[in-house]
Amino acid sequence: SPDDPAYQAFYRGAQTERDRAYHQGTVWPWLLGLYADAVAAVEGPDAAKEEMMPVLAALSAHLRTEGCIGQIGEVFDGDAPHRPGGAPAQAWSVSEVLRVAKMASP
């Protein structure tokens, strides 16, 4: 949480700084699938689709134009502009984003 004193908004710097940010501020794209499942279970599939669309649009643009084209990075900064970090191509990030996109499609 950004309110936690240990929160690290950006994944950068020396190894020790990146290690702190790894579990104290970065966004892990593969968790989007679990979050979408939870929203669908609690609020219903339509609510999950509505909530996922802006996130899917941003990740789709990243997939097509940034970093390793056709891939999604391992982590993203917790604060805007949410730059990718870690491994430039993470299979489980791509697979969960594609699964959520399929869930959100009409």
Regions found by a protein language model. Name each.
Residues 25-30, 46-49, 53, 91:
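Conserved structured core elements
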